[in-house]
């Protein structure tokens, strides 16, 4: 499995803490730096949307959360090239642990997808904030 995220992958997030995109923006999800992160505003649900330059088959998602600010219920959905705004392809639902180390969530390889949306329906934070230091999507 290889990383599907590259310079041409567009990423959108539902919110950024205090609109401070420099310190907490989406670019920090994939910059490889251990001290930078994406931090959402309070409120649920939150989401991360990945728009790939071409169709991909996803087989796992890698996260590193900040303990205490973990998306404790994550729903992953996808859309095809023919209908990029129709997120009707259910990929998986997983429940990350409230810990700091990297966690990998594997599932059956998906059909060819144009976009993948990760929805955080619940958070370990009372206010619904999510903090992610690392995100990777693996597959073909």
What are these regions (language model features)?
Residues 39-41, 67, 96-98, 109, ...:
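Sterically constrained small-residue positions within well-ordered secondary structures
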Residues 33, 47-52, 58-64, 103-137:
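Hydrophobic/aromatic beta-strand segments within beta-rich folds
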Residues 1-2, 133, 140:
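Activation corresponds to long, low-complexity, non-globular regions
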Residues 86-108:
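Extracellular carbohydrate recognition and processing domains
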Residues 65, 78-80, 139:
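Residue-level signal for short segments within beta-strands and strand-turn junctions
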Residues 70-84:
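Short, surface-exposed beta-strand/strand-loop-strand elements in extracellular ectodomains
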Residues 1-53, 66:
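Disordered, acidic Ser/Thr/Pro-rich linker "stalks" and the adjacent N-terminal cap
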